Amino acid sequence: MLDIIKAIEAEQVKTDITEFNVGDTVRVNVRIKEGNKERLQAFEGTVIKRQNGGIRETFTVRRVAYGTGVERTFPVNSPMLESIKVVRRGKVRRSKLYYLRNRVGKAAKVKEALNR
């Protein structure tokens, strides 16, 4: 039974995903369906979490919009994701950056990784 599930999941896993890590600033283009129209919406922010692996892998992006923190969680293998572009590489020493939620302004910045 487990082999059947793994075989089905292996077919659906995307292989053309951009390599990114926690702390990176990314721009995610998401397909939005409004009525019968479909358009792309960009969401740019810092990756604060990557969770699980395989087909169920998700990542959370945080940005501050008009003074309010906004976090969106995206499934990596979702067909609604058009593209993931790394804008800036970040240098962090944690796998989950939840501490950024309590910081404001320059304190919420992530250092840039010079060579990665």
From Swiss-Prot:
Q: Entry's InterPro entries?
A: Ribosomal_bL19, Ribosomal_bL19_CS, Ribosomal_bL19_sf, Translation_prot_SH3-like_sf
One term under GO cellular component: cytosolic large ribosomal subunit
Q: Which UniProt keywords apply?
A: Ribonucleoprotein, Ribosomal protein
One Pfam family this sequence matches = Ribosomal_L19
Q: Does the keyword Ribonucleoprotein apply?
A: yes
Question: PROSITE patterns per the record?
Answer: RIBOSOMAL_L19 (PS01015)
Q: Which GO terms describe its biological process?
A: translation
Alphabetized GO MF terms: structural constituent of ribosome
Q: Which SUPFAM superfamilies match?
A: Translation proteins SH3-like domain
What does the UniProt record say this protein does?
A: This protein is located at the 30S-50S ribosomal subunit interface and may play a role in the structure and function of the aminoacyl-tRNA binding site.
Protein family according to the UniProt entry:
Belongs to the bacterial ribosomal protein bL19 family.
What the entry lists under HAMAP family is as follows: Ribosomal_bL19 (MF_00402)
Q: What is this protein called?
A: Large ribosomal subunit protein bL19
**Protein's organism:** Clostridium novyi (strain NT)
Q: Which gene encodes it?
A: rplS
